[in-house]
């Protein structure tokens, strides 16, 4: 039996601000924006090419805004993806990789999968890691 991850919730303070950031800056696609009860609203967006949605809203999680850390967005070319996101106004750190447990600027020298990263912060301080994974490499 297959088990597929459908939705990851992230805590935000301002639903409209988060929606604008994820749609306009990150380039995600809106799939749901609806009230679900008195004082509750759920928004779901999906990164291009992903089957897992990101959800946020009012009254849907008790987690503190900005407490989501280490969510990974994988891309086949981290240099191109970082440039695109920076151009769209996303606060994104430099591309870096680990050498002997220390961060070094730039992508992994051989561009090995799972080795190059860049940090992204949403308006609430939720931290994403952009990670290079080129599935065509095998």
Task: List PLM regions with ranges.
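Generic signal for short, ordered secondary-structure residues
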Residues: 1, 63-64, 103-104
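N-terminal beta-strand motif that seeds the catalytic metal site of vicinal oxygen chelate
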Residues: 1-19, 68-71, 129-138
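Core segments of cupin and vicinal oxygen chelate
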Residues: 2-3, 9-52, 80, 87
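Acidic di-acidic motifs
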Residues: 14, 77, 122
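Conserved short beta-strand elements that form part of the metal-binding/catalytic scaffold
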Residues: 29-68, 75, 93-94, 112-113, ...
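Vicinal oxygen chelate
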Residues: 34, 73, 82-138
């Amino acid at each position: 039996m297959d088990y597929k991850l459908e939705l990851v919730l992230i805590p935000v303070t301002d639903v409209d601000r988060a929606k604008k950031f994820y749609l306009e800056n990150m380039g995600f696609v809106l799939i749901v924006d609806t009230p679900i009860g008195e004082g509750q609203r759920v928004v779901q967006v999906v990164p291009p090419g992903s089957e897992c949605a990101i959800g946020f809203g009012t009254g849907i999680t008790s987690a503190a805004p900005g407490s989501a850390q280490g969510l990974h967005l994988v891309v086949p070319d981290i240099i191109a993806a970082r440039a695109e996101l920076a151009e769209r106004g996303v606060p994104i750190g430099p591309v870096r990789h680990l050498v002997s447990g220390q961060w070094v600027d730039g992508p992994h020298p051989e561009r090995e999968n799972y080795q190059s990263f860049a940090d992204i912060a949403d308006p609430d301080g939720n931290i994403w890691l952009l990670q290079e994974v080129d599935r065509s490499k095998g």
